[in-house]
């Protein structure tokens, strides 16, 4: 019966990725039938996506009915509480490779249709053929033969020489089978290199035909109107697929050197680069074409993973130009691989890889029409708006940044590194790195590593650059005067002053007003920098800096110069605005305090008035009670009225006041007969001080003012005048009338000065003469000069020929001719020529303003017409008395003011303004006052706030106590230990105490203690916001400035008081009214500033005493100690944070490094075990991969500073011919 059946044993082991129809985990079981016979089913596994059935059954069918052995039918059932549902089914054909009596494992694929889409799953089974199948011995023999064949192929691929080949052929069968299994990928691809060459040539031909067809198509379109037929494009197949390119890449990675050599010898390497060029230069790219670019690059990378392949790639002309054009691809994988290949050329031996890389990037800029070199690389680092970065995108950015690090940090010359880094600064790399630094190490270890490399290399270069100026110790490089002085001192002994003068003269001729001029200045700066850093010519060595690129850099920097100027201007405006706001805040606080004080005072006064009113009410009540009592008393007594009248004597006169004054005047005479009025009361006694009675009124003003009013009737005669020379303390006599000088000295009243000696009379010329321009002196000015000695006697021998002089110096008489040309006349200049020229230049600033407008503005105090510097200039240009006299003398002769020059005309105008100098001085003070007041108030407020912040801080004392205990422990057992306190400057010396390894200071340790045990003290610096500003204030300077301001104000105040009142239509001088109001407000301000400056000095001395400091300590020293300590504390806190972060990063890197070392050790151990067994171990080259790993870890840059630059910079790798 068994001979008529096919029998198999089926083991259903488990399922994978099984879900229900709704896409969630279900409770499945499986039904299976073979040839339509009895169904077998497994048990139900509750809620499992990977149910383990472990079910076995025997299946059989009749050979007669099923000669072809049908497939196994599987049904996957979803079991539910009240229903069952088939969720998938399939038929699995029995494999032809079944071996009689041997179990073979298989996987049955299935698909489940869910509400969320199709779900792939599989069933793991084992089939044992019981009475049919292949013979085991026959199959083992076939397998043995196959392994021997494949091993022979493997020997050809792996054995590089005859010795290695001989060693491999001695391996036993088991080792050979193991090697074949290990190199299955290599053996699976059995194509010969010539097959791939054919594929590459076909693809290149197809692309060229497509390109030619496109040209023909466009040509035919242009001729369509002529009715010509377009040529037929030859039919080509679909071309090289992505899968076929992948096969080439796999072959290049897995095959041996003989295969690679044969591949190159057949021209496939050249075809590969040519094909990549066709893909790159395509105008538009599809997803498939981009994938083909990637696979071409993978092929090149696998070729370059060994030194032989590197030689092949370098031997192809423009191979790397093709690779560099892959940059900027829409597919980031292409960019990453292209960058990786370009990065490696900087580390290859025997070539100047960096120079080649810079040349390639210059070529890329020209081909892609970029405005700036490297701009596309920097743009790729920027995050797109609204796009959230993932770990993959951050890794991509780390590759771009590694490329920048290679470009900038590979050269051995610091000047080249600085120049290249500066290019990236201008492209905005610093701002981008600041944003990228926000991502943590865990989010992207690769990006964090590259940012660290960039910053560390930048810091080291800056330090190295600063060492170049070590010979100029103490030189302030930011001060141009100091730099120029040092330069002159340096070149003078060498005789280079002439060269410096020529350079300076040329610089003097450079324009500065337009963009071209600014660009020239920047270019000159860059060229001199290049000369100072290099001994090569600009633009010759492109590895240093091409001249064209230097010009582009200068153009960009020139554009930034006006922007920097605008930024500085805006900063200054912002500072002025902030200063103004601060001043207003201070004044607001002052006014609030005044209001509070007034409110308190008003409340106090009201209380006093209420108390006084209460007392008066009580007194009135008492008086009323007394009156009532007196009325009762008068009612009982009846005295005689006459007796009463005689008994009451008049009150005695009041005693004279102390002070020894004059006795009171006698009592007035009795009243006249008929006078009904009572006698007037006696006059009051004289006031304390005993001064004489007031003096008589002054004589009336010139012009006849009304006499003073008579004394009131009945008041007695006026008091007598004081005796001459009385000094009893009375008021001083009134001043003389305004405009009158003091009386002449005794004996000199009405006397005249000595007259000038008689002079020789000089006749007046009959003709108009050419004038002699001189400044004449009148008789008053020659007193005591040599001119006072000239008289009739000294001049009697001077007899000039006046007729001859008249003929020689007579003004030329020009006959009037009929002419339309205007008559040219020159203005007369009397003032000193230099002063006149400066005044003319100054007046030209007042465009559209007449001299009357200017002088009227001065007269009325109109500040809108002037700038602050105008007032100073006007004071300097005020005409002297001699100038006015000379101008007046000219006008007496000429009678025409229009003949005078503008400076002379203006001088006459401004001289006519009453008390012009006093007005200008007042305006000058007012212009400067607001700025001075603001500066003083800000300084005083900062000082006050700083003092109060330290004095009122609760954290400072506790912090000092911590420092005291910490210091006592460190100094324990020494003379400095067991201290009760310390000088305040100790807090600035904590940073000088270093740890045992010199990596940390006592400040670092203090911050750790504070953060751990006293976290509330960590923010102590936030409470000391004004301390730094207070340290910049000099108390002595503030006091001096307050005194100077008060002195200037008093002078202005006096000058305003002496101004005349208005005359004519204006009864009041508007200038005086305006400035009197200003003086009133200013007086209050200055009083407040004075009192505040005195108060802060008192508070400061109290603060010094509080900390045990010398009372003479300067604020800059005292507050500076706190400022320095705060800076050190803040720096130490950040250092601790950075050290903590860095330690964490190092720990993670070490863990990753250790893991990699363990994996490498396992591989090495495995290789060693195989070697001991007699197996030949292939050591696979991976030049590119190893270099990329080194760059990604940052190790590639660590030894750059120790490497000497190769002297042979023009050598290249020679193509290798095998």
UniProtKB/Swiss-Prot annotation:
Compositionally biased residues, Pro residues: 649-747
Transmembrane segments: none
Coiled-coil intervals, chain numbering: 563-638, 1034-1061
Entries under InterPro entries matching the protein: ARM-like, ARM-type_fold, C2_dom, C2_domain_sf, DAD_dom, FH2_Formin, FH2_Formin_sf, FH3_dom
Domain DAD: 1174-1209
Keyword Coiled coil among record annotations: yes
The protein, known as: Formin-A
Annotated source species: Dictyostelium discoideum (Social amoeba)
